[in-house]
A protein has these predicted regions:
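Short loop/helix-cap segments at secondary-structure boundaries that form the rim of catalytic
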Residues: 47-53, 112
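Catalytic cysteine-centered active loop of the rhodanese-like fold, especially the PTP/DSP P-loop
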Residues: 68-113
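Conserved beta-strand scaffold positions in the cores of enzyme catalytic domains, especially
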Residues: 38, 55-57, 102-104
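Mobile, glycine- and charge-enriched loop segments
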Residues: 29-30, 36, 61-79
Length: 132
């Protein structure tokens, strides 16, 4: 059997874009075994109040050092901050540090919540499930 036929049958994720909307990230997470990392570069206290489920807190001032120590440079990374400007700054810092696949999550946590993305945190835990 021709290997090209097999390659065309087995679906694969498209390459990561430099900017993504919340739907793209949600689709990746629903894919099954996503080989990706979500970084929340907001202040840790804000992160603890509520964040995308599974997002790692890495405040902007610690971002490069912590990411370099814990994440492979080839891993797909989705990053979000308090606003799109902070997100873009964080993404550029990561790219400058040698991370190859970094995507800015446009709209951040608000966009994620708007599409019903899963969240966790102190404030999130206080909201009854029926309140959504």
């Amino acid at each position: 059997m021709d290997n090209k036929i097999v390659e065309n049958i087995i679906p694969s994720q498209p390459p990561i874009e430099s900017q993504s909307d919340a739907h793209v990230l949600k689709s990746r997470l629903e894919w099954g075994e996503p080989a990706l990392t979500i970084l929340d570069v907001r202040d840790r206290q804000v992160h603890n109040q509520g964040h995308i489920t599974g997002a790692m807190p890495m405040p902007l001032n610690e971002l490069v050092d912590r990411a370099t120590a814990t994440i492979a440079k080839s891993r797909d990374i989705y990053v979000y901050g308090s606003n799109d400007e902070e997100t873009a700054q964080a993404a550029q810092l990561l790219r400058n540090a040698g991370f190859e696949h970094v995507s800015e999550l446009r709209g951040g946590l608000a966009a994620w919540k708007a599409i019903g993305g899963a969240t966790e945190g102190v404030v999130e835990a206080k909201v009854p499930p029926s309140a959504g």
